[in-house]
A protein has these predicted regions:
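Juxtamembrane/interface motifs at transmembrane-helix termini
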Residues: 111-112, 139-140, 190-196
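A generic hydrophobic-helix recognition signal that picks specific residues
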Residues: 61, 79, 106, 146, ...
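Membrane-embedded alpha-helical segments that form the functional core of polytopic membrane enzymes
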Residues: 95-99, 144, 148-151
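Non-catalytic, topology-defining segments of multipass membrane proteins
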Residues: 1-96, 166-225
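Transmembrane alpha-helical segments that form the membrane-embedded catalytic/substrate-channel core
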Residues: 22-37, 94-133
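Cytosolic juxtamembrane regulatory segments of multi-pass membrane proteins
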Residues: 127-145
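Alpha-helical membrane-embedding segments
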Residues: 20, 77-83, 126-132, 154-163
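Histidine-centered catalytic micro-motifs
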Residues: 108-117, 148-164
C-alpha cells in the first residue's frame, strides 16, 4: 500500500506488472512467493531444509531430486548451446519463449482469481466449491482460445470440475452458465484493460469481520508532494 502511495498510479502499475509477469513465476518456484503462509518459504527444487518441507509429502522428495538431475542436464545443454552457437541464439530460441510461457502462466493465475469486486473467503466462509465459483472467466478472442485451449474463457469450470477435458470445456461452461447464472463470474473487459485495472487497483486487502472475508481496499495513488 505504501509503494502505491509513493510511486503514483502509473509507476506502481508498471512495477506490479514487472514484478508479477517477469519475476513472479521464478520467485514462486524458488521461494514460494505469493503461495500463502501454509507452506512457508518453500522451494520447488530443494525439498528439505533450510526451506519448508510442508510443500512436499515425504514420498515425493526423491522425485524432486530426480527432477533436479534433469534440470542440471538441461542447463548443461543450454551452456553448450550458448558456447557453440552464441548466447543470442539460445536466448531467442529458448529463454525468450520460456519467458513468454511463464508470463502467460502468471496472467491466467492472476486474472482469473483476482478482481476488485471478488473477495477472498475466510476460514469460516470457505468451502472448495464456494472458492471455485469465485474463479472468473474472461474473453481472450478466437486466436488465443485456439492456442491455449480456451483456458481463460473457460477457467471457472477448470476449478469447479477439474476432470473436464479442454475439448469439452466450452460446452461445460455453457451448461454452468445456464445452471448457475447468479454465481457464475464473467468479466467482458478486454484482457489488457483488466490486467492494468488489477495491477493498479488490487493493492491491499482488509478483513470484513461481519462475514469473514477479505475485500480489496481502495488504493491511494496520490504521490507525496
Amino acid at each position: 500500500m505504501e509503494s502505491s502511495f509513493f510511486l503514483g498510479k502509473t509507476l506502481y502499475g508498471l512495477n506490479q506488472l514487472f514484478l508479477h509477469l517477469i519475476l513472479g513465476w521464478p520467485a514462486y518456484l524458488l521461494a514460494g512467493k505469493t503461495g500463502g503462509p501454509r507452506y512457508g518459504t518453500s522451494n520447488h527444487f530443494w525439498p528439505t531444509s533450510p526451506f519448508s518441507k510442508k510443500l512436499w509429502p515425504s514420498i515425493w522428495a526423491k522425485k524432486v531430486w530426480i527432477s533436479d538431475w534433469g534440470i542440471i542436464f538441461m542447463l548443461s545443454l543450454l551452456v553448450f548451446w550458448s558456447m557453440k552457437f552464441g548466447i543470442y541464439s539460445m536466448v531467442s530460441l529458448y529463454l525468450g519463449p520460456l519467458l513468454v510461457v511463464n508470463i502467460w502462466l502468471v496472467i491466467y493465475t492472476w486474472l482469473h482469481h483476482t478482481d476488485t469486486d471478488v473477495p477472498h473467503l475466510g476460514a469460516s466462509e470457505f468451502s472448495y466449491m464456494r472458492g471455485a465459483f469465485l474463479s472468473i472467466d474472461r474473453p481472450y478472442g478466437k486466436i488465443l482460445d485456439f492456442l491455449h485451449h480456451s483456458i481463460g474463457s473457460t477457467h471457472a469450470i477448470h476449478h469447479i470440475e477439474p476432470t473436464v477435458p479442454h475439448y469439452h470445456a466450452r460446452l461445460a461452461t455453457r451448461i454452468l452458465k445456464n445452471k448457475f447464472p447468479k454465481v457464475y463470474l464473467y468479466n467482458p473487459t478486454p484482457i489488457y484493460k483488466s490486467l492494468w485495472h488489477i495491477a493498479t487497483n488490487c493493492v491491499a486487502v482488509k478483513k470484513d469481520y461481519e462475514i469473514d472475508r477479505y475485500v480489496w481496499k481502495q488504493p491511494n495513488h496520490n504521490k507525496i508532494k
